[in-house]
Amino acid sequence: MLNYEVFSKENQPTEAEIKDFMGAEILELFSDLDDLLREKHKVKPKLAYSSCAMDSNIWRGWNIKYKKSGKSLCTIYPQQGYFLVLIPGKYFEVRNEDTVDEVKLAIEIRKSEISAKKKTKQ
């Protein structure tokens, strides 16, 4: 079941409802990534709704956006039993720890890109 089928656009889910929807088996991986983004990168998550119907609606529904210096660092799309991570230019389907490690590396690269662009504007 996809997240838009459970959470309507008009009814924003709570953090607890999103975690419950994803399921215990994937929650540790999500929490690991969320903690990294909040603590190391000092970004606050923001819930948003996407109406994108691409790829059989997997991008549709509530997502969690993380921005750094006004630029998208990544967006997490929670699904039942897994989650998708969209980083500008690439995406990952996270179902295991190996994929989370790939996502962490991609986030570090994205943060470096944002920092480099910020420095060239100064």
How would you name each of these model-derived features?
Residues 1-122:
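Charge-dense, helix-prone N-terminal extensions
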